[in-house]
Amino acid sequence: THLLVDVGISGKKTVEGLNGLGLTGNDIDGILITHEHSDHINGLGVMCRKFGIPVYGTKGTISAIREVSNLGKLDDSLFHVIRADEKFILKDITVNPMKISHDAAEPVAYRFQYGGRRMAVATDLGIYDEYTVESLKCMDALLLEANHDINMLQVGPYPYYLKQRILGNRGHLSNELSGKLLSRLLHDNL
């Protein structure tokens, strides 16, 4: 089973990356979308049209994607609505989406289970709470956002509104907060 979490780069670059792994778009069994921001869906239209890959996302995310005009024509039959904290199975992988705090329609992170092993992909978190900690405990592998150094962001070139968005509870985890979260999740098998 081969799954993609988001398709933020162009369809062409996605295909090139897959080819580098010895795969093609035809090998992909599903695309799991975390949220509708362009850096997570740029290549979605191309991948759907060229390869007919099923797409999974929350109702809010899929509705927001349908409003994005630069993705081109999308086949509605490829889209499947999922819900946070409701497991589903794609071939031999159990997928369990979890709610996250981000400035998008209905964003999620994804937890996976295969052959007794667990992993999670958790990016674009504005904050974390006990739900997040409990949801990410006991993973064997974890891809976790560590987005910025607070001081560097504050003195950097971004406009004020963007700095506030990134620093907000629905923005992105700072390196420090990511480290604190990771320290609560660490165990011998991670």
Q: Model features per residue range: what roles?
A:
Residues K59-A109, Q113-G116:
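Metallo-beta-lactamase
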Residues H37-H40, I62-A64, A105, I127-E130, ...:
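Active-site environment of divalent metal-dependent phosphoester hydrolases
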Residues V121-V133:
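Active-site glycine- and acidic-residue-rich loops that bind
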